[in-house]
């Protein structure tokens, strides 16, 4: 494979940095959504395997998935810009793309603010930058409206389950923790050393969360918590909800929908107090 890559590199050794941005590749679902929001939809030529929004993204060639990046295909497609996800794309493969001279925009999202910033920064590569600037402005305006609406929600201790075999959750500052925090959520596993720790049912029972959230596609055993209704306040009080995984787990303008969904659930708890 490396011999083939080297041959391709020699063929395309001209500098890509100085070329106008006409051909764009996205390596993550959220990056694809951000690209469309930034006005780059007409320039996208390939995306990641799970890029399914907006609808037009489904028709594009696929060059990456959870296993890695198809370097040979990307080199053949000769993109002017690659939108990468440093938290999800293999670092060594991104380094190789850099060595080949490709221009890479790293879509880092550690805060809700970063979503608007990513849209705005990528808009410079659009033929009509105003599209991205308008979408970034609309996102920020809507975010502040939600902040004003839900700023007085009380603190609620929650548990967010990403999968059931094993049970995986989120810790620390890792996405989508900020969505829950925006709504007054306090992660019961916030202090875990791993970013996405594996936990046990016993640990969840001991943490006594007031609310529990799951993603429908990640939960295969719908009855796994049934025996523990009396031990976990969230279950005893029927504060157990499914969330739209795409809204929540992808840092895009649709995160606003996730915020409203989570905040409304926390608000319903407050109404019962």
From Swiss-Prot:
Disulfide pairs? 183-263
Which BP terms does GO give this entry?
A: cobalamin transport
Q: Which Pfam families match?
A: Peripla_BP_2 (PF01497)
Q: Which residues form the signal peptide?
A: 1-18
Task: Give the UniProt entry's GO cellular component terms.
Answer: periplasmic space
Where in the cell does this protein reside? Periplasm
Q: Which family does it belong to?
A: Belongs to the BtuF family.
The name this protein goes by in its record:
Vitamin B12-binding protein
Say which species the protein is native to.
Answer: Vibrio vulnificus (strain CMCP6)
Primary gene name = btuF
């Amino acid at each position: 494979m490396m011999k083939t890559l080297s041959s391709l590199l020699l063929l395309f050794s001209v500098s890509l940095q100085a070329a106008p941005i006409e051909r764009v590749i996205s390596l993550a679902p959220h990056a694809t959504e951000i690209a469309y929001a930034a006005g780059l939809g007409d320039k996208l030529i390939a995306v990641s395997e799970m890029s399914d929004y907006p609808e037009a993204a489904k028709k594009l060639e696929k060059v990456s998935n959870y296993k890695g990046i198809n370097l040979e295909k990307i080199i053949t497609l000769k993109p002017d810009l690659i939108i990468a996800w440093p938290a999800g794309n293999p670092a060594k493969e991104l380094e190789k793309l850099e060595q080949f001279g490709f221009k890479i925009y790293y879509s880092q999202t550690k805060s809700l603010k970063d979503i608007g910033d990513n849209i705005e920064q990528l808009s410079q590569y659009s033929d009509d930058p105003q599209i991205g600037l308008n979408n970034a402005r609309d996102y920020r305006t809507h975010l502040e409206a939600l902040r004003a609406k839900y700023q007085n929600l009380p603190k609620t201790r929650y548990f967010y389950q990403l999968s059931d075999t094993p049970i995986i959750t989120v810790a620390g500052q890792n996405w989508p923790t900020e969505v829950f925090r925006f709504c007054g959520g306090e992660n019961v596993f916030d202090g875990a050393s791993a970013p996405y720790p594996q936990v046990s049912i016993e640990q969840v029972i001991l943490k006594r969360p007031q609310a529990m959230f799951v993603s429908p596609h990640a939960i295969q055993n719908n009855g796994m918590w049934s025996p523990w209704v009396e031990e976990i306040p969230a279950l005893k009080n029927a504060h157990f909800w499914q969330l739209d995984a795409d809204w929540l787990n992808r840092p895009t303008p649709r995160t606003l929908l996730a915020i409203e969904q989570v905040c409304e659930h926390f608000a319903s708890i407050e109404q019962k107090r």
